[in-house]
């Protein structure tokens, strides 16, 4: 008869994020000793690291923080939502975020090379995968700097950690700038802009949109004399959809994001938006 309880299984699953059958097998082999079972799960996980390498990691979380005018955000992935909400995975993601802040890493490769607890973070990624029994990966890293930086994390499900993260930075000061930065960060989470300014949109993309607008208007039989105005109007619509400062503000559609920031004497200087798996 097994010398462990359902509570022991639950506790070890919470510690490791491992599946129920894996936990039961480890407890059986360890004669009910939780610490020995934990070691067995880790050993089994390390042996399976090569097999996990090709697996898809579409779940996970976004973690972000702001320190001294610098916002840092990471997306950390795993295979299942069960692991994504587990304590060990969340702990590892927070450790990766702390390493990103401390190291000043500019990209994921630099972050993986950063030393944490006396070893490169890349080794901790492997160890986390071994413990959790799933492939774990740091997908991307963002860093945004400004006088005021807001980090906004959004849960798409109450049972999961944040799936959407935003960093938004402005040059400005005072409560008005801080409030505007936060409100726009929330807006970015919902409205998914691709660019900060019109000038950031690649010229070839603008040319393509202008050409499509012209050809569409001609196909609709619009008068030749009206084409320039129609094309510019449709191009404006493209900018409103894709450029942050041109977008109608989420909390007040009568204002653009640019107008909201102007009213707060704040100038947008950068943003980043992550959604897990997107």
From Swiss-Prot:
Main location class: cytoplasm
This protein's UniProt keywords? Cytoplasm, Elongation factor, Protein biosynthesis
GO terms under cellular component: cytoplasm
Record Pfam families: EF_TS
SUPFAM superfamilies attached here?
Answer: Elongation factor Ts (EF-Ts), dimerisation domain (SSF54713), UBA-like (SSF46934)
Domain of life from the UniProt record: Bacteria
Q: Where in the cell is it found?
A: Cytoplasm
User: Region Involved in Mg(2+) ion dislocation from EF-Tu: which residues?
Assistant: 80-83
The GO molecular function terms of this record are: translation elongation factor activity
PANTHER family (alphabetical): ELONGATION FACTOR TS, ELONGATION FACTOR TS, MITOCHONDRIAL
What functional role does this protein have?
Associates with the EF-Tu.GDP complex and induces the exchange of GDP to GTP. It remains bound to the aminoacyl-tRNA.EF-Tu.GTP complex up to the GTP hydrolysis stage on the ribosome.
Family the entry assigns: Belongs to the EF-Ts family.
Task: Supply the name of the protein.
Answer: Elongation factor Ts
| Taxonomic placement | Bacteria, Bacillati, Actinomycetota, Actinomycetes, Micrococcales
Its gene is tsf
